[in-house]
C-alpha cells in the first residue's frame, strides 16, 4: 500500500512522525561508536546511567544509555575526558521524541592505540608541510604583552608568571584560564587562542600545562587545535612539559619549550643578562675606540717624522737647485749646439761658394750669353753656332757684364 502523501490537509500526528522516525533509526542495527566522555550521570541506586559522548574532532555529541551494572563491571572507573569505544543500538523514544544509543559494551581506548593515532596524525600533518621550519614565526626579542593559556590556579601559570617577572619585571600578561584536559579542553583552548590572536597588543602566546599522563594530554594532540595554531598570526609557544611522548602541539608551534618555566625563559629575556651584555659591549667598544685612536696617533707621528714634513721647504729648495742646474746644462748644450751648427753652415757656405759661378768668375772665367733680337731672354752660348757673326753678346765677369758683338767664329781643332 502506497504511503499517504503528506500535505497540510493530511498532516501527520506527532505519534505517527515519531513512529516513522523510530522505525528508520532501528534499521541501523547495532554499531560501534568511538568518542570522548564529557558528562557521566550515575548513581549506585540507579538502574540506568546516562553518558554524553562527544566527537573530539567536531562539535557533535550523542546521549548514551546503559545499565549501571555495566559501568560497575568495567576494570577502571570512567571519568570525563576518557576515550572509549561503545557498542550499542540506536534507540528513539516515541513518547518524548528523544534519541539515545542503548549501550551494552564499553571499552576504554588503550594508551598504545592513542599513541598510534597521535603518530598517524603527526605523519599526516607533516606530509601537509605544517611542520616546515619556514612556517615558524619568529618571536619578538622583547614582548610587551604575552598571552598565556593555561589551567586556572595551575602550577604552570605560577611558574610562567614568576619566572617571566623575575627576568623582566615590566612584561605584561593576558591570561586566559581554560580546561587543560577532558572534553572541554580543545574548544576552550581554541577559543582562547583566537581571542589572544585577535588582540593586537599580544606579541606572543604561550600554551602551558605542567605535564600529565598520555590521556590527560590528548587535547594537545587533537587535529582541530593543531590547525588553529597554524592559522594563528601571532607566534605560539608550546609548553606542555611532557617527555618523551610529546604532543603534536610541540611540532606545529613556532617554538617548543620543555616546561612552562623553560617557556618563560625562552620568551622573556633576562634583564640582568642584557644589562651585563650591554656593559660588555660598551667596554669592548671603548677598548676598540681607544685602540683605534692609539693606532691613528702612531700613524700620524710616523707621518710627522718624515723629512718632507719635518722641513717642507728643503724639498722645494732641492728641486729648485736641481731645476737651476738643469737650466744651466740645457743652456750650455744649446750654445754648443749653436756654435757647432754655425761652423757647419760656414763650411757649407764656403763649399757652395767654391763650387758656385761667382767663384769661377773670380778666377778669370766669364759667362757669354747671346741676346736674341726678338727681345727674349738671353741664352748661354755653349756652341759657336749659337752666336754667328754680328750677334749681340753679353759677357758676364766677376764684377759685372760687358756688351759685345760677335765678329767671327772659329771652330775648335
Swiss-Prot record:
GO terms for cellular component: cytoplasm; exodeoxyribonuclease VII complex. Pfam families: Exonuc_VII_L, tRNA_anti_2. It catalyses: Exonucleolytic cleavage in either 5'- to 3'- or 3'- to 5'-direction to yield nucleoside 5'-phosphates. One of its GO terms (biological process) is DNA catabolic process. Transmembrane segments: none annotated. The keyword Hydrolase applies. Its EC number is 3.1.11.6. Its main location: cytoplasm. GO terms for molecular function: exodeoxyribonuclease VII activity; nucleic acid binding. It comes from the Bacteria. It is found in: Cytoplasm. Keywords: Cytoplasm, Exonuclease, Hydrolase, Nuclease. InterPro entries: Exonuc_VII_L, Exonuc_VII_lsu_C, OB-fold_nuc-bd_dom. Heterooligomer composed of large and small subunits. NCBIfam families: xseA (TIGR00237). Belongs to the XseA family. HAMAP family: Exonuc_7_L. Bidirectionally degrades single-stranded DNA into large acid-insoluble oligonucleotides, which are then degraded further into small acid-soluble oligonucleotides. This is Exodeoxyribonuclease 7 large subunit. The lineage of its organism: Bacteria, Bacillati, Actinomycetota, Actinomycetes, Mycobacteriales.
